[in-house]
Amino acid sequence: MTVLTAVFVGGTYMGVRLLFSKPPSLPEVAADTCRNRTLERGEQLSTNQVRVNVLNAGGRSGMANRTAINLQTAGFLPGTVGNAPDEVRIGNVRVVAREPNRVDARLVGAQFKGKVQYTKGVPGDDANVEVLIGKKFVGMKKKPVTAMKAKNRVTICVPDLTEPVS
């Protein structure tokens, strides 16, 4: 009986210590989720090297999600999908990128029918490009453009596929 009491007291003591102990720390995640890649003039950038966020600015439910799925089918890496702020007004499609004339922005813009507006800005999260779908969205081209040549030498942050998107 003494042995059982000792096991019970010891187990209770260990259990209470574990219950109130500091949890183990999570492993550190690298701050960079992409690596720089320099493309020389004429070198190709493919869709699987571009992460795209898609935001709905048109009000039709599900447009951003459907467009994101279609872009993934074309080979683009998925980014954030959601709604644009209420004050944003878009006709067909707006492509937002750090450099709107750069090959990654042009490759994304080449997927859409109709007039595509290019705007300089910083896409959210770790995306290279952000697409805003407007009220007059006419859709995506039936045959996707899967690669595009760089018009000039450019350094692009290519998503690191070893890190999961959150």
Model-derived segments and spans:
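Residue-level signal for the start and early helices of compact helical domains
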Residues: V7-G10, E43, V54, D86, ...
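A broad, low-specificity signal for short, low-complexity segments enriched in glycine/proline
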Residues: G10-R17, L39-G42, V52-A57, R89-V96
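Extracellularly exposed regions in secreted/surface proteins, prominently low-complexity, repeat-rich
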Residues: K135-S166
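BRCT (BRCA1 C-terminal) domain core and associated BRCT-interaction motifs
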Residues: R66-A68, A74-V138
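N-terminal membrane-targeting segments
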Residues: M1-E28
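Extracytoplasmic low-complexity, Pro/Thr/Ser/Ala/Gly-rich segments
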Residues: S25-P85
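Residues that form or flank phosphate/diphosphate-binding pockets in enzymes
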Residues: G10, G62-M63, V103
